[in-house]
C-alpha cells in the first residue's frame, strides 16, 4: 500500500479526532493559576458548614452565613488579635449568643411527619475580666438574668467569696487539694510553705467538725480566711525549722494570706457565706470585674472560681442532661494569668504563673467531659503556653501584625501562607477561623454587636440599669453577703430608696428591700412617686 516517507503506514500517522495521545492532550490541559487574593466561585475546602442553627458568627467573604454548633465549645476556644482588631466585639457577641441559644427539638404535635421546632436553651457563662470594664456593656442587652460583680472599695456591686465553701456532694479532701493549687497558682509560695498551708487548711476544717473524707451535705459550717491566718501561724510555731526558714515562711503568711485580709479584701474573702453558692454560679450569666484587686488577688479569684465550677460539675455530672454545654468560662487578657510555658517550677524558683498555667492546661483536658467550655482571649498567641493553644478546638484570629504570632497560631490550624499574610492587614471585625471538621480555616466578618463602640456605663449608670434586672433584686435579698444594701447612715439609705422607687419592680421585691433597710412602713405603693413620707427606725 501507499506509505509516507517514514516507516508508519499511510493513514496511521493521524488518529481520529476523538483519540489523542497523552502528549498531544497535555498541551490543552493546565491547572488554574490564581494571583494572590483571587478566588474561584466554587465550593472550597475552607468553606464553613452551612447549617442554619447554632451560634451565628457572621458573614463569610462569599456572603454566606456562618454558624457553629454550640457543642463545639465543649472543646474550648482561643481568640486573639491586637488592640482595636475587634476581639472584644467577638467576645461580647459570643456571650450574648450563648445566652440566647436555641436548640432544635422534635415537634410531637405533628403526627403525620417528623418536624422540629426551636426551643430556648440558654447557656450560662462567667466572664473573668482582669483589666478594663468593657463587658458591662452586656447590661444594655436583653439579658434580665445578668449579674455584674465588681469588688472594690465602696463598690455598688460587691462580691463575697469564701474559699472554704465548696459544692455539695464533693469530698473535703479533694477540695483541700485543689485549694492548695489555687494558692500556689496565685502567689509565689516556695517549699516548705505549701506543706504548712495544707496542714493549716485541714486544721481549720477539723475545728468546725469536718473530717477529710467527709462528703459535703451543706450542714456543717465553713471556716474563714482569718481563721486560716491564725492557724497557719500556729502550725509554723510548732515546726523545728531554723529561724531563717521560719522568717521566710512568716513573710509568706504576711504577704500572701495577710494581703487577702486587708481593707476591701477582707470584705471579699473573710466571710462566712459567699455571694453565690458553688451551684448558683452555673445558673446565671455573670461578669466579674477584677481590675481593682491587683494581679495576685485577681488571679486567686480567677483560679478559685474555675475550681468551684469544675468541682460543681464533677459533683453533679448528670445534671442538666438535656444541655450539650452546661456552662462557659471566658478568661479575658489571659496573659495576666497564663505564662508562655506550662512546666511547673519547683523549689525556690517557684513561679505562680507557671503553676497557674499548668492548672489551666489540666483543666482544659478535664472539663470537656463535664460539658464545660473555656474561651481564652489574649492579644498575642506568643504570650500563651503552646499547650493552651493546642488544647482548644475553635481558633479565631483577628489582626496580628507580628510574623511570629501568625506563624505560631497558623501552625495549629493548617493556615496557608497567603491566609496568614492577609491576617496582618485585617480590618476591625475580620477574622480567620478554624474548628474541628475543616481542612483549612476560612475568613469571615464577625457580627457587630449593636451599640458596641459607644462609651461603657459608669458605676452610677450601671447601677440604674441593673436595678431593672430581676436577678439583681434576687441578689439583693442576700443582705448579709452584699455591702450594697448595708448603708452606713439613714440619709444615704433614704437616697437609695428614692432611686429604687423610681424603677419598675415587683411589690414583693420592694417589701424585701424595705425590710432589709429596717423601715417601719411606707405610705405609698412601691411604683408610685414618693413624697418623702417614710418613717425610718430611730
Predicted regions and their residues:
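Phosphate-binding and hydrolysis-coupling loops of NTP-dependent motor/remodeling domains
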Residues: 1-48, 418-474
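Basic- and hydrophobic-enriched, low-structure N-terminal and domain-boundary segments
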Residues: 1-82, 89-90, 94-96, 101-119, ...
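Generic beta-strand/beta-sheet core signal
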Residues: 58, 71, 80-82, 128, ...
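Flexible loop/turn segments at secondary-structure boundaries
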Residues: 75-76, 86-87, 133-136, 231, ...
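Conserved ATP-driven motor cores of ASCE-family P-loop NTPases powering translocation/secretion/packaging/pilus
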Residues: 83, 93-96, 167, 348, ...
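P-loop NTPase motor domains
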Residues: 93-365, 369-372, 431-435
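Conserved P-loop NTPase motor module
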Residues: 300, 427-538
Amino acid at each position: 500500500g501507499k506509505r509516507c516517507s517514514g516507516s508508519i503506514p499511510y493513514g496511521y500517522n493521524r488518529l481520529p479526532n476523538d483519540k489523542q495521545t497523552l502528549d498531544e492532550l497535555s498541551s490543552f490541559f493546565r491547572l488554574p493559576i490564581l494571583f494572590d487574593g483571587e478566588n474561584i466561585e466554587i465550593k472550597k475546602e475552607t468553606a464553613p458548614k452551612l447549617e442554619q442553627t447554632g451560634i451565628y458568627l457572621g458573614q463569610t467573604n462569599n456572603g454566606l452565613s456562618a454558624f457553629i454548633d454550640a457543642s463545639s465549645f465543649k472543646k474550648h476556644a482561643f481568640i486573639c488579635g491586637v488592640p482595636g482588631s475587634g476581639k472584644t466585639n467577638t467576645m461580647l457577641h459570643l456571650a450574648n449568643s450563648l445566652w440566647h441559644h436555641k436548640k432544635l427539638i422534635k415537634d410531637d404535635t405533628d403526627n403525620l411527619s417528623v418536624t422540629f421546632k426551636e426551643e430556648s436553651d440558654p447557656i450560662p457563662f462567667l466572664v473573668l475580666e482582669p483589666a478594663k470594664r468593657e463587658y458591662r456593656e452586656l447590661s444594655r442587652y436583653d439579658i434580665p438574668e445578668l449579674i455584674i460583680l465588681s469588688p472594690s472599695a465602696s463598690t455598688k456591686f460587691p462580691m463575697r467569696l469564701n474559699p472554704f465553701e465548696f459544692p455539695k456532694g464533693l469530698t473535703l479532701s479533694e477540695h483541700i487539694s485543689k485549694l492548695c493549687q489555687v494558692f500556689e497558682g496565685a502567689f509565689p509560695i516556695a517549699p516548705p510553705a505549701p506543706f504548712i498551708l495544707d496542714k493549716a487548711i485541714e486544721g481549720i476544717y477539723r475545728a468546725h467538725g469536718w473530717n477529710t473524707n467527709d462528703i459535703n451535705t451543706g450542714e456543717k459550717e465553713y471556716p474563714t480566711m482569718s481563721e486560716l491566718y491564725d492557724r497557719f501561724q500556729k502550725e509554723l510555731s510548732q515546726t523545728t525549722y531554723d529561724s531563717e526558714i521560719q522568717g521566710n515562711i512568716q513573710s509568706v503568711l504576711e504577704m500572701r494570706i495577710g494581703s487577702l485580709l486587708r481593707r476591701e479584701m477582707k470584705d471579699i474573702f473573710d466571710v462566712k457565706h459567699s455571694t453565690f453558692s458553688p451551684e448558683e454560679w452555673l445558673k446565671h450569666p455573670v461578669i466579674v470585674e477584677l481590675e481593682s484587686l491587683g494581679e495576685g488577688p485577681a488571679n486567686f479569684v480567677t483560679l478559685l472560681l474555675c475550681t468551684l465550677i469544675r468541682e460543681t460539675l464533677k459533683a453533679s455530672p448528670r445534671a442538666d442532661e438535656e444541655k450539650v454545654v452546661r456552662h462557659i468560662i471566658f478568661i479575658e487578657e489571659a496573659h495576666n494569668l497564663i505564662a508562655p510555658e506550662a512546666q511547673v517550677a519547683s523549689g525556690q524558683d517557684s513561679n505562680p504563673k507557671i503553676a497557674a498555667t499548668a492548672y489551666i492546661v489540666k483543666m482544659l483536658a478535664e472539663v470537656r467531659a463535664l460539658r464545660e467550655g473555656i474561651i481564652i482571649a489574649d492579644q498575642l498567641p506568643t504570650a500563651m503556653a503552646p499547650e493552651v493553644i493546642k488544647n482548644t478546638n475553635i481558633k479565631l484570629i483577628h489582626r496580628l501584625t507580628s510574623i511570629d504570632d501568625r506563624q505560631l497560631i497558623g501552625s495549629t490550624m493548617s493556615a496557608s501562607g497567603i491566609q496568614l499574610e492577609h491576617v496582618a492587614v485585617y480590618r476591625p471585625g475580620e477574622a480567620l477561623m478554624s474548628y474541628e471538621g475543616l481542612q483549612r480555616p476560612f475568613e469571615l466578618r464577625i457580627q457587630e454587636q449593636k451599640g458596641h463602640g459607644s462609651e461603657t456605663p459608669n458605676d452610677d449608670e450601671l447601677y440604674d440599669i441593673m436595678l431593672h434586672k430581676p436577678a439583681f433584686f434576687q441578689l439583693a435579698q442576700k443582705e448579709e453577703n452584699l455591702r450594697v444594701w448595708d448603708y452606713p447612715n439613714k440619709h444615704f439609705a433614704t437616697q437609695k430608696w428614692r432611686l429604687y422607687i423610681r424603677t419598675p419592680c415587683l411589690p414583693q421585691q420592694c417589701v424585701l428591700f424595705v425590710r432589709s433597710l429596717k423601715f417601719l412602713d411606707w405610705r405609698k405603693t412601691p411604683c408610685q412617686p414618693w413624697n418623702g413620707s417614710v418613717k425610718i427606725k430611730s
